[in-house]
Design a protein with these regions (language model features):
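Conserved mid-core segment of classical short-chain dehydrogenase/reductases
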Residues: 88-106, 125, 129-135, 155-158, ...
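Active-site helix of classical SDR
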Residues: 120, 162, 170
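Short, small/polar-rich loop/turn modules that mediate ligand/substrate recognition or access, typified
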Residues: 178, 183, 237-240
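Residue(s) in the substrate-gating loop at a strand-loop-helix junction
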Residues: 146
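Alpha-helical segment proximal to the catalytic Tyr-Lys
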Residues: 125, 174-176
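Canonical Rossmann dinucleotide-binding motif of NAD(H)/NADP(H)-dependent dehydrogenases/reductases
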Residues: 2-33
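Catalytic Tyr-X3-Lys loop
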Residues: 87, 98-118, 142, 159, ...
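C-terminal substrate-recognition "lid" of short-chain dehydrogenase/reductases
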Residues: 220-244, 249
Length: 253
């Protein structure tokens, strides 16, 4: 898909992977709307991109519906969706204080998996009805999983389950939307340098980078964004989860 002039939605676009994707979309000429809970950062990124920001809770149907409608009123109906909203708390099944907190497990599943599903289904209602472009393509949906979906570590039961769910629903959604001209792909990042990782001590970040086979460093958010752009531009990519991890296979802990 040629992104120039196309409307795009990026959830979690106020920082990290989402912000990098939003910036690269804007550089390609897309009209970007950021949906995020962080108003200060979201407004800042949107202003930088001459885009649009909407405060949005991806787990709430009304919030997402209103966010998509607001973005449509400003930029027209979007053909591009990049789902980056998510959280990543770690906890053991049985820790020092007893069993894994059930509320924490539910929250991670709700934000990461159900939130992605919620935005995707509501986005698709209008996008599947747009006029087709080249190859009868109407839109592209990109979701964000994690290598934890495949080799989760101790303490990642909830996170791995949430990201594994995103991976598992990629193909069924792509198959459903095939006759409507909407492609669906998922990116499964490894250890990328994001604000969440920046809070770790420098020596820990260095050690993490050295654990990557090649290139032996942390990944960059811009590399995630670059892969997202390739997915958008390559019309034969569909129904696939792509690992972006420098050949990393995570150890148990």
């Amino acid at each position: 898909m040629d992104m120039n002039g196309k409307a795009a939605i990026v959830t979690g676009g106020a920082s990290g992977l989402g912000a990098a994707a939003a910036r690269m979309l804007a550089n390609k000429g897309a009209k970007v709307a950021i949906l995020d809970l962080n108003e200060d950062l979201g407004e800042t990124v949107a202003k930088e991109l001459d885009g649009y920001f909407v405060t949005c809770d991806v787990t709430n149907e009304q919030s997402v519906q209103e966010g998509l409608e607001a973005a449509t009123n400003v930029h027209d109906c979007a053909r591009i969706l990049v789902n980056c909203a998510g959280i990543g708390n770690a906890a053991r099944m049985v820790g020092k204080n007893g069993a894994h907190d059930f509320g924490l497990f539910s929250k991670i599943i709700t934000v990461n998996l159900i939130g992605t599903f919620n935005v995707t289904r509501l986005f698709a209602v209008s996008t599947t009805q747009l006029d087709p472009l080249e190859d009868d393509e109407r839109g592209v949906i990109i979701m964000t999983a994690s290598v934890a979906a495949f080799d989760g570590q101790i303490g990642q039961a909830a996170y791995s389950a949430s990201k594994g769910g995103i991976h598992s629903m990629t193909l069924p959604i792509a198959r459903e939307f095939a006759n409507r001209g909407v492609r669906v792909c998922t990116i499964a990042p490894g250890v990328l340098k994001t604000p969440l990782l920046d809070i770790l001590p420098e020596e820990v970040q260095k050690s993490l980078g050295e654990s990557i086979p090649f290139p032996q460093r942390l990944g960059h958010a811009e590399e995630f964004a670059s892969l997202a752009m390739h997915i958008l531009e390559n019309r034969y990519l569909n129904g696939e989860t792509i690992r972006l991890d420098g050949a990393l296979r995570m150890a148990a802990k």
